[in-house]
Design a protein with these regions (language model features):
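Rossmann-like NAD(P)(H) cofactor-binding subdomain of soluble oxidoreductases
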Residues: 93-154
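A structured beta-alpha segment of the ubiquitous adenosine-cofactor-binding alpha/beta core
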Residues: 56-110
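Hydrophobic/aromatic beta-strand patches that form the interior of the parallel beta-sheet core
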Residues: 33, 75, 90, 140-142, ...
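Short beta-alpha connecting loops at secondary-structure transitions
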Residues: 34-37, 152-158
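Phosphate-coordination loops involved in phosphoryl transfer and adenosine-cofactor binding
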Residues: 5-8, 86, 114
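NAD(P)+-binding Rossmann beta1-loop-alpha1 motif at the extreme N-terminus of oxidoreductases
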Residues: 1-52, 59
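Internal alpha-helical scaffold of NAD(P)-dependent oxidoreductase catalytic cores
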Residues: 30, 156-187
Length: 190
């Protein structure tokens, strides 16, 4: 079920949303690198995912082999450089524009020009986030709803510079993850 053109996924932020998004991508067969400024938070996120999977196995909702395979696809990243070869980056960090713009500028310098850089933001302008990014056509919003593993809807948010091809690629990826993509323009509250 893995979307091959976006084979490796990186998730930045390991709170509730970041962990849920990492679980969704790993469940779809992607190797997932998880980065957080607090390395212990990444370990806690993976432990939380393991606990939720164990509960599903105990209830007969998931085979233990599937749970083990999903967990084996989750990899802690100890610095942003470890995300350099990701095909898709999903940022789920602090909802502060200055944090996101600095982070996306760093990612643009580290990752290949073909890497799709996305934010899970629900309120910050994608156009503003992309303003300082080389190749801003690859920047988009990928807004999951909480809890990400359960909720089917994902907003694919385009900024002024986001290319149609990037939006299409993200919609195909999200559909491959069993989610329902909804295309949105970057406006207040989408």
């Amino acid at each position: 079920m893995m979307t091959t053109s976006l084979a490796t996924v990186a998730v930045i932020g390991s709170g509730t949303m970041g962990a849920g998004i990492a679980e969704v991508a790993a469940a779809a067969g992607h190797p997932v690198r998880i980065f957080d400024i607090n390395p212990k938070a990444v370990d806690q996120a993976i432990e939380g995912i393991a606990g939720r999977l164990a509960s599903r196995v105990a209830r007969g909702k998931l085979a233990s082999e599937q749970a083990d395979a999903l967990l084996a696809r989750l990899h802690p990243a100890h610095d942003l450089a470890a995300l350099a070869d990701a095909d898709l980056v999903i940022e789920a960090a602090s909802e502060r524009l200055e944090v996101k713009t600095a982070l996306f500028a760093q990612l643009a310098a580290i990752c290949a020009p073909s890497t799709l850089l996305t934010s899970n933001t629900s309120s910050i302008s994608i156009t503003a986030i992309a303003a300082g990014v080389k190749n801003p056509e690859r920047v988009a919003g990928l807004h999951f709803f909480n809890p990400a593993p359960v909720m089917k809807l994902v907003e694919v948010v385009s900024g002024l510079a986001t290319s149609t091809e990037v939006v299409e690629q993200l919609c195909q990826c999200v559909s491959g993850w069993g989610k329902q993509p909804v295309r949105c323009r970057s406006t207040p509250g989408f």
